[in-house]
Amino acid sequence: MLYTDDVLNGIIDTAASSESFRDQCQAEIDALYTDNEQSVLWQCMENKPDLIQEDLSRIIRNNLNTSPPAALFRGISKKTMEYLEDLRYVGAIIEFNRVMSFSRDWQVARNFASYSFYGTRNIFCINNAPYAYNYQEAIFKMICGAPPEEFNGAYPEATRKSNLHLVNDEDEFMFPAGTTLRVDLIETHPLNNLYTVWHLTVLN
């Protein structure tokens, strides 16, 4: 979680009522990203289609944060579990050809890995990553800076509010395509034996 509920609600109210606040947020985004790059980042609110993978990976590499959280988590999908079938050992090297999203919040990863979503009950944990892209920070500011007409529906500020809550809760960080990882440990979670945790180190 980026902000507490009280702070988040204050930001939401300011974004809805203050054009100067929105302009300031947008100016900060414009200083970092082109219009095309902003369009790519907006699309990631829903998913990360093949069409934007190359551009998204480039954006990530150009805007890496070298002080990410000490631990980042990701619920493992069924498709990824198939890929990992022959990599269930310490020292195995994992490389993905797509952008990968992680969260600083264990609960977010657990929810994705649970039976209500992926159903694998397996979770990646990257420890002490040398870098990551703070997508949450970027898209949060973009949503704050967007004019009301950017949001669909009869109640644009309600859409802004729900989007900001979603982004705030997911705590999303990204790694570019081609990131190489090493398996350091595969263990049952010590506080929840229903889940298996893959501890990983970023190699490149």
Language-model features, listed with the residues they occupy:
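Mono-ADP-ribosyltransferase
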Residues: 1-204
